[in-house]
């Protein structure tokens, strides 16, 4: 049975703010159904201040069990685990990015979302969780290359794929050998990707990440000296959370490197956590000669997010790309 929570807002409530219409997590979570599929979740279920079942999202073990249950019930991921301390992402938000990305592809293809293994996506920083490739292949049939600089992250992702053979054939893992680069040294000169996606490091240093986390917990009324809280409520290792110069520097580097692969990628995309980083990124992309730059806004609960998409292909090149690679697309809604 769910146990009552403390008066503090330990558990997040699903807000009226809309997820993408195709997101499988619209509405409230079906905890009885989730527990039926994954009984281990039951010990983490609490009653939140609104009288509804939920979990304590400050508890990494609870979040991991919750994610495992969601992945099994909605995405046919039978075995999923990550090492302690690695990023344990919120599934609904990750799914939203993919659905809006699918819409972007559809808008580039007369309202028809291209689906199936003929399409390839590059996930920059796939992490130990391998979330974007798992969700993207399940929802749209796309093939993925999941790239990372961290060997342990890739080992964890490989273990997930080994436990889920139906995904393994569609998802390739690659190590970026040089942490100074994003695409260079990773993308072969002869290959093409229909899209790239990325959840960039947010902070400039571990110290900055720690300070930001303490501010967050204080604002939530959870900065209790007697309680050991995780660095972030969804965890994260060094390369997942911070890089030199923070998000702004990472985005500038990604934009700069993308130019060398202008004809090999249809849509480059990346999440942008700080809205204040948008103007510089957009200006940088204009300077580099991007032919189309878009900001796609999203909302998950109380959180506002967005991703930036850009392409260097002109209209003639886009038409040729669509004819060659997207001819087996399926109409929207199917």
Swiss-Prot record:
PANTHER family: RNA N6-ADENOSINE-METHYLTRANSFERASE METTL16, SAM-DEPENDENT METHYLTRANSFERASE. GO terms for biological process: rRNA base methylation. The keyword Manganese does not apply. Residues 1-25 are annotated as: Disordered. Pfam families: Methyltransf_10. It is found in: Cytoplasm. Specifically methylates the adenine in position 1618 of 23S rRNA. Its EC number is 2.1.1.181. This is Ribosomal RNA large subunit methyltransferase F. GO terms for cellular component: cytoplasm. It catalyses: adenosine(1618) in 23S rRNA + S-adenosyl-L-methionine = N(6)-methyladenosine(1618) in 23S rRNA + S-adenosyl-L-homocysteine + H(+). InterPro entries: METTL16/RlmF, rRNA_lsu_MeTfrase_F, SAM-dependent_MTases_sf. Gene3D superfamilies: Vaccinia Virus protein VP39 (3.40.50.150). Its main location: cytoplasm. Belongs to the methyltransferase superfamily. METTL16/RlmF family. Disulfide bonds: none annotated. It comes from Pseudomonas paraeruginosa (strain DSM 24068 / PA7) (Pseudomonas aeruginosa (strain PA7)). Keywords: Cytoplasm, Methyltransferase, rRNA processing, S-adenosyl-L-methionine, Transferase. GO terms for molecular function: 23S rRNA (adenine(1618)-N(6))-methyltransferase activity.
């Amino acid at each position: 049975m769910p146990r009552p929570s403390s008066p503090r807002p330990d558990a997040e409530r699903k807000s009226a703010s809309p997820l993408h219409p195709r997101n499988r997590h619209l509405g409230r979570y079906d905890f009885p159904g989730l527990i039926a599929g994954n009984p281990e979740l039951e010990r983490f279920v609490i009653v939140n201040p609104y009288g509804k079942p939920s979990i304590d999202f400050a508890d990494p073990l609870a979040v991991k069990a919750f994610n495992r249950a969601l992945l099994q019930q909605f995405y046919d991921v039978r075995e999923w685990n990550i090492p302690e301390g690695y990023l344990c992402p919120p599934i609904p938000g990750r799914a939203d990015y993919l659905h809006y990305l699918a819409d972007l592809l559809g808008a580039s293809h007369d309202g028809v979302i291209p689906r199936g293994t003929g399409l390839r996506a590059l996930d920059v920083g796939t992490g130990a969780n391998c979330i974007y490739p798992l969700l993207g292949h399940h929802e749209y049939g796309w093939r993925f290359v999941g790239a990372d600089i961290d060997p342990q992250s890739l080992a964890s992702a490989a273990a997930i794929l080994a436990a889920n053979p139906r995904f393994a054939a569609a998802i390739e893992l690659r190590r970026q050998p040089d942490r100074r680069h994003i695409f260079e040294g990773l993308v072969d000169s002869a290959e093409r990707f229909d899209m790239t996606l990325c959840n960039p490091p947010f902070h400039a240093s571990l110290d900055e990440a720690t300070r930001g986390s303490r501010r967050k917990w204080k604002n939530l009324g959870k900065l209790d000296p007697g309680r050991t809280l995780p660095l972030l409520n969804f965890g994260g290792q060094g390369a997942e959370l911070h890089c030199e110069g923070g998000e702004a520097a990472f985005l500038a580097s990604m934009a700069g490197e993308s130019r060398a692969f202008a004809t090999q990628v249809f849509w480059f995309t990346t999440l942008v956590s700080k809205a204040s980083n948008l103007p510089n990124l957009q200006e940088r992309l204009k300077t580099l000669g991007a032919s189309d730059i878009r900001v796609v806004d999203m909302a998950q609960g109380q959180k506002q997010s967005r991703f930036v998409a850009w392409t260097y292909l002109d209209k003639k090149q886009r038409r040729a790309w669509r004819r060659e690679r997207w001819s087996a697309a399926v109409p929207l809604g199917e």
